[in-house]
Amino acid sequence: MKLNKFYLPFFLIFFTGIIFPQSTSDKVVDVKVKVPKVVSSNKITEAEIILQIKNGWHINANKPLDENLSPTVISFKNNPNIQIKKIIYPEPVITKLQFSQSQMALYEGEASLKIQFMVKKDFKAKALKVDGEVQYQPCNNQTCLFPTSKNFSISLKIKK
């Protein structure tokens, strides 16, 4: 039986979905958050977002070398009590994989991102929760899964 060229892409997408179901992609990365025990309002504070990438997998860096690849991006839900000053992404590993013709910028193992933020000075409560999301595309040496995201929260105790 010959596969028509029109049907081949659909067959490949369906077949890849069976081998690597979408639910696999959100199990490739765990997100851990490290923050100081207490933060002061109106002062720049740094938090660490640690992406723990499962062995045998990698994710594209924040600035992939190929514009067609999905970058790893951290974002935060709008919160009027906090101001994100800067997100510092780690240096990627530059390597060439079996399926790639050119070099790629990747994170593998553990990637540590720094978030510089400031709680607004007129914030009066003793605690604050900041919700964020990391978007990434997990890949191994044979294939890439669909881009996915994982939510995380930063819980802050505010010094009065």
Residue locations for each model-derived region?
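Bacterial Sec-dependent N-terminal signal peptides
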Residues: 1-25
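Extracellular/lumen-exposed scaffold segments
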Residues: 22-160
